[in-house]
Amino acid sequence: MIPVVQGGMGVGVSASRLSSAVARENGVGTIASVDLRHLHDDLLAESKINPSEEKYTQLNCTALDREIQKTKADANGKGMIAVNVMKAVKDHAAYVRQACESGADAIVMGAGLPLDLPEMTEGYHKDVALFPILSESRGIGIVLKRWMKKGVLPDAIVIEHPAHAAGHLGAASVAGVNDAKFEFKRVIEETFEVFKNLGLESEKIPLILAGGMANFEKVKTALKNWGASAVQIGTAFAVTEEGDAHINFKKTLAGAETEHVVEFMSVAGLPARGVRTKFLDNYIKRESKLQANAKADPRRCTQGLNCLTSCGLRDGLAKARQ
């Protein structure tokens, strides 16, 4: 195995094509579980017939199973196949169970504290590795203590730096992503101290650094100087030929300059980072007004998906995206 984990990227950015390509090189290929029905024309068509939340979940589980089976077939028995599940998604438990039943090698969970991941994977602990995504040592300690009560330990911990990663970020606010408590070297040192205090030093739980691992020097520093066991890389894989995203998405991402990257609050109530496209720019210009008029109303979501546990638009959360 090479010490590289391909980050999970949705919707449909990392599915079977990308994850199998990474696995074939003896890395960890990761399928993003969110709303995979969009990659399957028959499932997308079916979802428009008498739509319901339950039907969307069922169809997404079917799509997830298809993606896992195709990844396994195309990986030729090499590497590992992981499934990324967002805790913020309402039906996260269903996707975790489907991933386990479909034969995924690992579950990676972020976008919220994965405190109950051991319960969700009951019966599969010998077969499926568990990788929580966290950003600082306090959260790592909380998760470890909770999991230890269930007799379960993480098979690895992904430490994601909110100032450098893309997608949803593990900070309380946009302003907080640059807090010194998230610095990799500090978090690793503090995490080793947490291991010591909990009597886990001998377990040698691998730490995987995620965020900004964009060149060899950064990877080498993480592995050689800081004590990380591997790195997680997302954006660099997203724009590859093997990536599952639309070509226009890849061109936009690959062509973005540093000044085009912007932080904002996602509809899930978490800080996020992305490219300032025309669509996002129009939203950001109107954000203050939209947030000032936030109100709880399930009808405000035109798709009626009810897909998130907490939704800025549906629940009228003024600090989240509308």
Predicted regions and their residues:
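Active-site entrance/lid segments in N-terminal catalytic domains of soluble metabolic enzymes
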Residues: M1-E201
